[in-house]
């Protein structure tokens, strides 16, 4: 058959050649005479089965060609007959016959294949806000329920609409960005069964609705010749189709070499870096460089300025007149600004050829990286007359030195430096002062110490003036007394607009001779000695008083509020709180161990209490006591702390009172013992083993890591702070639930931990733990707030940790050595934890429930940075206070989820009334912790005996409950089976 068809084709070609050469007996159709070619079979659709023949015949007077199209692909032949011997599903498509006049007729052929109901064209792309076609045409048009389905039975988005076409596929209308990565199947029912196509994953190209975002690493550059110029331009857009380039304004020629690097950040964020570099900049490279980017929406640009100088420079700008007048005893600040490039290496202030080592500061005018302007300030306090003169500021860098001199004149009353009688019969006064003093001479009869009624002024014989190094004007004045014939007193009086002073010469005639004159001295040596002694005594008393006031005074940090008037809180005097003697515990039943912490006033000691639970049971406790050197003030403060703890009652997340010894010896306060010490040191120990995940399925990995390491310190490690000592235990792999459940009822009843459960301190730390700590501390603070109690020193160092990783809020108080703790900064006569304090507490000494919320936000930052100090690298100085006033806040710590950082930021709101309450914080964190952690915490809270369940109410409502709740029993002294 194929041979016959080949012969037929050859014959047709031969006839065509003959027709071209000899002409045709039939005239060619003119363009206006063409008609549609006809196709046999004469139908718009044809259905054949797989394996059958497809035979299509096109009839037309002229030549024709067949075109087959399916899934965007096409093929063609120039015969008038299309034959496919064994049809396959892929032969499904549109067959078009076109004649020489461009007219065409079509027939759509379905090749029914039971094994292949859909033709699939992958991948699937769509453009936002446009329709997109899912190319899954049917091979059998007689199926039903042709539609789209989500993969794995997932529903399609509610707003997704589509239309079906068995020949083309399914068109999704108005594609949205949210459909990106949507998994789809085409589906249809055949013979009562649902059939699915291959999986489609829709990739949405975002619609461009804005110009690109363009930024540069540095807005201006100042360089010396030969230095490298490098600037980075960052372009962000939703699509990689964005175009970008560097352009030098007004100069198409440049030596700069551009480099480009790009990547996708997520699904709809495209980032491109355009770096421009000049390896060795020259002066003529100076100019403005523009980073230009455009997309289909529009264009954007940003510029950076390059200035290249031949050599470095320093330009000084005094911020005041170079001549300054100041009154005696006043303060003055000498301020200069200067520009320097390269950076200044040496700065100093010089006075009278002497370098000043203090009283001045030098700092950049802004924190901008390109800043070249600096400020230097010299602070002169309570200037004296002899401290005037020239003050010179000198600055240098690697290229140049520069200086500026300021002349300071101190307005002082005249001072008589010398007054003497010269052998030649001349009286002389040497006077210094500013402005220039006027010297007058007066005579009065009689040998008086002062002239009650002066006569004169006398004629001055000689007077001249000069300038002293300190800026004073020195006047030398003299008169001739040889003409005097009578006893008398001569007064040298110096004055200016600041004041006046005098010196006296008295003399007498004896016979015909004149007695040698002596200058009068105002004070006798005895009077001078008395004044000096009195001054020294005053200085000694002031020093002793200052040292006494600087001594840190101990007070209870926790304050109980009695009344709120606006922002003014009235606190209950803790000494007026009642104390129930049922808390008393026999001293002889306490056995003391090691010291857990010590401060200036007292210490906390580990102890064993016998009979606290039941008569034959021992319990490890912590006992707070005063040192023997404590005064009455400290003893009253410790008693106040005891009363506050007894007033508060019990809660799972505070260090609870167990008992006290107040009679028959020094006061002892017995509280719960927390074996893992403070949370701050616990976090720092766990940094290396931290797992940045809160999923339970990481538990075994974390434990395996810990078992391979050398053992970390735990409750069994005597080297740890605040640690109990127990024998070692054997280990099995526990779960997180075991870890917290092992505490059972927290630390209220001391018991041995089951050896099969690994010690909490040897387990790795993960994100779930940090969320749990956040939640527990918020619960504890909500309890304190419900009792109208303000903590005032909430920080990780004041949170203790016990079995089951239960956190407990405490007040170390007298057991903390704040004098040697860098977290406590001297402010006035107190040492305060400034970095944890709210602005209203720092600047206005206002402590409220809201200021505790601020401190809680700082605590969260400590927690999620695994024990780092807040505001790292920033000393507490005037700049720190200024930044806090201006709204500076810390960035998110490394391990904080976005939701927790949002809580931190709300805690740091400048308006205290906009900060959340602790009750609201608890609700926010509850949404983040896992159900298992929340369930375990609830069980621990429920099984603790006599637990109060306070409801954190509004602050104004809390006040009504003050003083109404004092515990009459010892709620923690219960039997083990309670």
From Swiss-Prot:
The gene is KIT. Belongs to the protein kinase superfamily. Tyr protein kinase family. CSF-1/PDGF receptor subfamily. Residues 547-978 are cytoplasmic. Coiled coil: none annotated. Its EC number is 2.7.10.1. It is a single-pass type I membrane protein. The keyword Nucleotide-binding applies. Numerous proteins are phosphorylated in response to KIT signaling, but it is not evident to determine which are directly phosphorylated by KIT under in vivo conditions. This is Mast/stem cell growth factor receptor Kit. Residues 1-25 form the signal peptide. The chain crosses the membrane at residues 526-546.
């Amino acid at each position: 058959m194929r041979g016959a068809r080949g012969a037929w084709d050859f014959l047709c070609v031969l006839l065509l050649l003959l027709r071209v050469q000899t002409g045709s007996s039939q005239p060619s159709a003119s363009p206006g005479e063409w008609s549609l070619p006809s196709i046999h079979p004469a139908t718009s659709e044809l259905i054949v089965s797989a394996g059958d023949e497809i035979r299509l015949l096109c009839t037309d007077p002229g030549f024709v060609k067949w075109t087959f199209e399916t899934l965007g692909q096409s093929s063609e032949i120039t015969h008038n007959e299309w034959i496919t011997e064994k049809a396959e599903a892929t032969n499904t498509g549109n067959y078009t016959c076109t004649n020489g006049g461009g007219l065409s007729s079509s027939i759509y052929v379905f090749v029914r294949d039971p094994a292949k109901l859909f033709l699939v064209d992958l991948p699937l792309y769509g453009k936002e806000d446009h329709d997109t076609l899912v190319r899954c045409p049917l091979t059998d048009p007689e199926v039903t329920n042709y539609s789209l389905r989500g993969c794995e039975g997932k529903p399609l988005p509610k707003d997704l609409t589509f239309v079906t076409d068995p020949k083309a596929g399914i068109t999704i209308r108005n594609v949205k960005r949210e459909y990106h990565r949507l998994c789809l199947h085409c589906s249809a029912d055949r013979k009562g069964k649902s059939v699915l196509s291959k999986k489609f994953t829709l990739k949405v190209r975002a619609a461009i609705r804005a110009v690109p975002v363009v930024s540069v690493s540095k807005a201006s550059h100042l360089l010396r010749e030969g230095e490298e110029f490098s600037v980075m331009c960052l372009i962000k857009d939703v699509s990689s189709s964005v175009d970008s380039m560097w352009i030098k304004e007004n100069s198409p020629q440049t030596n700069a070499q551009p480099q480009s690097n790009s990547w996708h950040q997520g699904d709809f964020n495209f980032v491109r870096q355009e770096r421009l570099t000049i390896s060795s900049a020259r002066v003529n490279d100076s100019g403005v460089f523009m980073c230009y980017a455009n997309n289909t929406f529009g264009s954007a640009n940003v510029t950076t300025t390059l200035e290249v100088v031949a050599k470095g420079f320093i330009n000084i700008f005094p911020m005041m007149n170079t001549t300054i007048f100041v009154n005696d005893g006043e303060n003055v600040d000498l301020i200069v600004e200067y520009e320097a490039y390269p950076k200044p290496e040496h700065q100093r202030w010089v006075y009278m050829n002497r370098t000043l080592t203090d009283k001045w500061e030098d700092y950049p005018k802004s924190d901008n990286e390109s800043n070249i302007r600096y400020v230097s300030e010299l602070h002169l306090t309570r200037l004296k007359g002899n401290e005037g003169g020239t003050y010179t500021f000198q600055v240098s860098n690697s290229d140049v030195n520069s200086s500026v001199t300021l002349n300071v004149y101190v307005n002082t009353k005249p001072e008589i430096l010398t007054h003497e009688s010269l052998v030649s019969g001349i009286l002389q006064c040497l006077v210094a002062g500013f402005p220039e003093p006027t010297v007058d001479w007066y005579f009065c009869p009689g040998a008086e110490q002062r002239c009650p009624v002066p006569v004169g002024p006398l004629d001055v014989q000689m007077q001249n003036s000069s300038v002293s190094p300190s800026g004073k004007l020195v006047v030398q004045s003299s008169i001739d007394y040889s003409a005097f014939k009578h006893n008398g007193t001569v007064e040298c009086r110096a004055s200016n607009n600041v004041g006046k002073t005098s010196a006296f010469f008295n003399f007498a005639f004896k016979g015909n001779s004149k007695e040698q004159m002596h200058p009068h001295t105002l004070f006798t040596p005895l009077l001078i000695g008395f004044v000096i002694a009195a001054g020294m005594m005053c200085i000694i008393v002031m020093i002793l008083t200052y040292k006494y006031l600087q001594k840190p005074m101990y007070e209870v940090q926790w304050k109980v509020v009695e009344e709120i008037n606006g922002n003014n809180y009235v606190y209950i005097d803790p000494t007026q709180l009642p104390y129930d003697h049922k808390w008393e515990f026999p001293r002889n039943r306490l056995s003391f161990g090691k010291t857990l912490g010590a401060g200036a006033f007292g210490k906390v000691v580990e102890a064993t209490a016998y009979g606290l639970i039941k008569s034959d049971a021992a319990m490890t406790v912590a006992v707070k006591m005063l040192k023997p050197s404590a005064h009455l003030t400290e003893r009253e403060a410790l008693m106040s702390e005891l009363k506050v703890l007894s007033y508060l009652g019990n809660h799972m997340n505070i260090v609870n009172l167990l008992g006290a010894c107040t009679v028959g010896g020094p006061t002892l306060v017995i509280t719960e013992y927390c074996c893992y010490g403070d949370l701050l040191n616990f976090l720092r120990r766990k940094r290396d083993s931290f797992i940045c995940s809160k999923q339970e399925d990481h538990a075994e990995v974390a434990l395996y890591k810990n078992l391979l390491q050398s053992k970390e310190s735990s409750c069994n490690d005597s080297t740890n702070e605040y640690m109990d000592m127990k024998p070692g235990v054997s280990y099995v792999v526990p779960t997180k639930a075991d870890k917290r459940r092992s505490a059972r009822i927290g630390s209220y009843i001391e018991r041995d931990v089951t050896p099969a459960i690994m010690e909490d301190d040897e387990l790795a730390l993960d994100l779930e733990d940090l969320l749990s700590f956040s939640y527990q501390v918020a619960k504890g603070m909500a309890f304190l707030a419900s009792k109208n109690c303000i903590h005032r020193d909430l920080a990780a160092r004041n949170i203790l940790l016990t079995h089951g990783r239960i956190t407990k809020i405490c007040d170390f108080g007298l057991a903390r050595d704040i004098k040697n703790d860098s977290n406590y900064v001297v402010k006035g006569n107190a040492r305060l934890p400034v970095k944890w304090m709210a602005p209203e507490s720092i600047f206005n000494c206002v402590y409220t429930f809201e200021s505790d919320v601020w401190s809680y936000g700082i605590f969260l930052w400590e927690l999620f940075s695994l024990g780092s100090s807040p505001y790292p690298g920033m000393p507490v100085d005037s700049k720190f206070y200024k930044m806090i006033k201006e709204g500076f806040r810390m960035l998110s710590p490394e391990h904080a989820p976005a939701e927790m950082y949002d809580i931190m930021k709300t805690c740091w709101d400048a308006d205290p009334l906009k900060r959340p309450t602790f009750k609201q914080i608890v609700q926010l964190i509850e949404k983040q912790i896992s159900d298992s952690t929340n369930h375990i915490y609830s069980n621990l809270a429920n099984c603790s005996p006599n637990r109060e369940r306070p409801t954190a109410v509004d602050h104004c409502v809390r006040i009504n409950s003050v003083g109404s709740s004092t515990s009459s029993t010892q709620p923690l002294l219960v039997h083990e089976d309670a």
